[in-house]
């Protein structure tokens, strides 16, 4: 979780050729985003991916120390996805959920190229009411008019 499993030199030697090829094929096919899924602290990995033409990463786990505000300053064109601490859903504390979302979502949305999402999948400890609070606030912060959860079917 603390960083890369291989050195940047070995990444360039062993991984970069494949990432370059995949990103190139994606661009040639008109796909605007070449994304990678990687766990742990990915701060050192991002510059290497950018060298390869990869322009997106997810889920940006919180606990290992990723900082999307720092990454946004350094890589303004890179697509960022995630970075909302999944543990806030497990705890179900409305003020913790509000704090997590309001501290991150507005600033990152304003910077562009950000998809707000959890820093991993929803865990079994998350309750339905907690998830509804999270989604309602997320919709409020993103200006989505579909707004409130749970939704009930019309009629």
Each predicted region: which residue ranges?
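Active-site loop segments of alpha/beta catalytic cores
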Residues: 1-155
